[in-house]
Design a protein with these regions (language model features):
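Phosphopantetheine-dependent thiolation modules in NRPS/PKS and related acyl-activating systems
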Residues: 5, 9-114, 118-141
Length: 141
């Protein structure tokens, strides 16, 4: 019997509650990131902003961003050169959740430096855009 009050019933209740909480958090995350993920392909924006940059180079940069935030590569061309990296971070972590982040910005900075051989911190600002970071990363190319 799996009725309430038994150890098995209590475990099932806890598991159901945890599952419902996880679903609610995932739905809330999708809602907060919707302004990025609901876009059509931003490839033309990247090509206009960086007409001489090879597509593969732009994609590699975007993949660094997506990887640092643990987002799917299928979201690559949902990000615009005008997007601020902090806006992406703030959409993922509303002010109440920021204390428990997964070090996405630190991971991005390390990956950026490893891949491009330049430290992004000297140019980092609260309002820095992905396009500005890409330009800084590829200025010597």
């Amino acid at each position: 019997d799996l009725s309430h009050g038994t150890p098995m019933g209590e475990v099932l209740t806890i598991l159901l509650f945890c599952g419902a909480a996880m679903l609610a958090v995932a739905a809330f995350e999708r809602f907060r990131l919707r302004r990025f993920w609901s876009r059509r392909c931003t490839g033309a924006e990247w090509r206009r902003a960086f007409p001489t940059a090879p597509k593969a180079e732009i994609w590699t940069f975007l993949d660094l961003v997506l990887s640092a935030f643990a987002f799917s590569q299928s979201k690559r061309l949902c990000l615009s050169p005008n997007d601020q990296i902090m806006a992406l971070y703030q959409a993922l972590y509303p002010s109440l959740l920021r204390a428990g982040d997964a070090m996405e910005l630190e991971t991005f900075a390390i990956s950026f430096q490893e891949h491009y051989g330049v430290d992004p911190l000297p140019v980092w600002r609260e309002d820095i855009t992905l396009g500005q970071l890409f330009s800084y990363a590829t200025k010597g190319s």
